[in-house]
Amino acid sequence: MKFIHMADMHFDAPFTVLNTRSKLGEKRRLEQREAFKRIIEYIENNNIEYLFIAGDLYEDAYIRETTIEYINSLFKKIPNTKIYITPGNHDPYTINSMYSTFKWSTNVKIFKNNVETVENDAVDIYGYGFNDYYCKSSEIENIKIKNKDKINILITHGTLDGGSAPNLEYNPLNTAKLKQLGFDYIALGHIHKADYNTEENQRIVYPGSTISMGFDELGKHGVILGEIDKEKVKLEFLPIDKKEFVERKIDVTNIASVEELIEKINEEQIEKDMFYKIILVGKRNFEINTYYLYRFITEENIIKIKDETQINININELSKEINLKGLFLKEILDDKNNENIDENTAEKIIEIGLNVLK
């Protein structure tokens, strides 16, 4: 059997990181639609039997009915494909949610917050969805497979081996326990970075977010194309998002003024299919105000500027001066040398202190 496994599309997300530049958030929401349409067209053109959507298809707080109508219209274009959706923490199945109130295409099955099984001729699909924005436990690790001769698929949204306290609120799952259940494939959502291995017959998979949501999601994004039988799983990553979020560093050490820095940023080779974060590094010889820089950046695809520079001064020499500035620097250097504070903390304190003592 062949399937597409996707998750974390987050339809109608506000894309706040893009709203600093004119209408880019709005454009990104249109790109969501285009990306989803490409998935459906691929399914249609390649006779894919199953579509697994492992949660966070949309943003419950922002979703518009017109967007749901658009999604559903595409579902209707692939009537021979069985579509299974397990709601996540951003799109839980509640009494007033679109999952509950909207009339979905007949080839769509939406799971609720109890483990359900859909039996097909050769494949049984098990699913579990959120009914709230949090899910601290579920029945998943107690599932008993009904027919082990068939291909058995589990779809859910959750945190695999989460560990930290915040992740324990989003359906915490344990890899070892999941493997013991005996599923041929486990389609997960929630983690926005893809986690799959085509070489090791991996059966517990995150496809990552379908399109990148921001600078914490660098690289290519898309869906998993899978082909499975009882002996093996064949997986392929299909890039869907035509845009990427990219970080680029600029060393300011040899730049003499803010005007020269603006010129340097505007000379960067910017690709139209990328969103850029410029990270300023090195030793600076002038004050940097990122809000001021934004006003003069000509490329709208430069979304964010982060200042990680350090002030270019000879701290040891200045600490010898017989004045308040010298006494301040000597105190900080003594603390650093005695390992009372680390180097990064010392640099931050020095920078703040020197600004105060100007």
Residue ranges with predicted function:
Residues 1-69, 340, 344, 348-358:
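N-terminal active-site segment of His-dependent metallophosphoesterases
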Residues 4, 124-126, 224:
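Conserved beta-strand elements of the Class I
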Residues 22, 50, 59-205, 209-214:
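His/Asp/Glu-rich metal-coordinating catalytic cores
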Residues 45-47, 147-149, 269-272:
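Glycine-rich phosphate-binding loop signature in dinucleotide/nucleotide-binding domains
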Residues 119-122, 214-221, 313-316:
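Short, charged, surface-exposed secondary-structure boundary motifs
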Residues 189, 194-258:
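A conserved active-site cap/scaffold subdomain adjacent to cofactor or substrate pockets
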Residues 230-358:
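Accessory, non-catalytic peripheral segments of nucleic-acid enzymes
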